[in-house]
Amino acid sequence: MSSNSDNTECFGGVNYAEGMRKRKRNPVRNSTFQEYLDARNARYPRSGSTSDSDEDYTTRSKYESDVSEFKKMMDLETLPPPKAEPQAQKAEPDAAKEEPVSTTSYILNEWVAPMIGHFLAMCMYELLFK
């Protein structure tokens, strides 16, 4: 394999840089991202375009219509404001509201008591069935 001055030749005598320069479609060039987007949008028009040459793109698919209907349903700005509950039909009176629970009682009720119950159940199982 001969060495090339710009060091672009690879195994098998394939010059990858030259192949990239000779590409007909999508030539490699230095461009900005906005130029790339403009070129891409020119090749693949969006569904909102009005030209007659892109009929395939203007028809909305079933998926797109379903998505737009879902967005309409989920749009919180168009929903009516929630109705206020009448004061006479409250779910619970003011006296029945829960008071804040201390951390100690929460730990005892939610963690320690079930563990003790599980331990006692295991002891009873050992006594009865073994």
Swiss-Prot record:
Q: Which domain of life is it from?
A: Viruses
Ranges annotated as biased composition (Basic and acidic residues)? 57-75, 91-100
Annotated stretches, region: Disordered: 1-100
Q: What protein am I looking at?
A: Uncharacterized gene 75 protein
**Organism listed in the record:** Equine herpesvirus 1 (strain Ab4p)
Lineage per the UniProt record: Viruses, Duplodnaviria, Heunggongvirae, Peploviricota, Herviviricetes
